[in-house]
Structure formats: structure tokens, C-alpha cells
Amino acid sequence: MKLTPREKDKLLIFTAALLAERRRARGLKLNYPETIAFITAALMEAARDGKTVAEVMHYGTTLLTRDDVMEGVPEMIPDIQVEATFPDGTKLVTVHHPIP
């Protein structure tokens, strides 16, 4: 299988997000990389599902709480930017303060 660099990045994000999801389900608090992967993958999937940019931006703030992540992680993530594929093309989505 031959993948483009972008496809490899998406696959890596998905794999890291899957690991984060499993750890969260076991009651573990997510660290910085797990948190980024979890939110990024969810945003990409929401865009793929046909949500608007505004809906995806709002959705990004509802995924995790401070109780879901390790201490200090929310302060390390002032915003997340993701290039997501929407039905009408690829767009840059920015979520400010993803962990309220």
C-alpha cells in the first residue's frame, strides 16, 4: 500500500486517537499528545460526517473536560488547528480553548 504523507499523518492521528479513547475508557487521564490526537480525530470525523465549519468548531469544545486530562494539559492547548475534509473541500478549522 502506498500512502501520501498526508494519508500517513491521518493514519497516525487515528491510531493515537484510538489509543487515547481506550485509555480514557479505562478511566485514565489523557496526556498532551493523547489529548491532541483525540480532539483532532474527532474534528476530522465530524467534518467528514458533513457538519459545517462552525459546528465542528463548537463540537471541539465539548469533547473533553479538565477531569479527562492530566493537570496542566488544558493550559498547554490554547487552540487546535486541523485541516479537515468537508463535503465541499478541505478547510482549516481552529478551535480556541478546546478544554474549557
Curated annotation (Swiss-Prot):
Tell me which domain of life the UniProt entry assigns to the organism this sequence originates from: Bacteria
**Catalysed conversion reaction:** urea + 2 H2O + H(+) = hydrogencarbonate + 2 NH4(+)
Q: Which SUPFAM superfamilies match?
A: Urease, gamma-subunit (SSF54111)
Any idea of its EC number?
A: 3.5.1.5
Q: Which molecular function terms from Gene Ontology are attached? A: nickel cation binding; urease activity
Q: Name one Pfam family in it.
A: Urease_gamma
- Keyword field contains Calcium: no
**What is the designated name of this protein?**
Urease subunit gamma
Top enzyme category? hydrolase
This protein's species is Burkholderia thailandensis (strain ATCC 700388 / DSM 13276 / CCUG 48851 / CIP 106301 / E264)
* Keywords of the record: Cytoplasm, Hydrolase
A single Gene Ontology CC annotation of this entry is:
cytoplasm
CDD domains recorded for this chain?
Urease_gamma
Q: How does it assemble?
A: Heterotrimer of UreA (gamma), UreB (beta) and UreC (alpha) subunits. Three heterotrimers associate to form the active enzyme.
The principal localisation class reads cytoplasm
Q: What family, per the record? A: Belongs to the urease gamma subunit family.
Q: In which pathway does it act?
A: Nitrogen metabolism; urea degradation; CO(2) and NH(3) from urea (urease route): step 1/1
Its annotated compartments are: Cytoplasm
Disulfide connectivity for this sequence is: none
Any single biological process term in GO: urea catabolic process
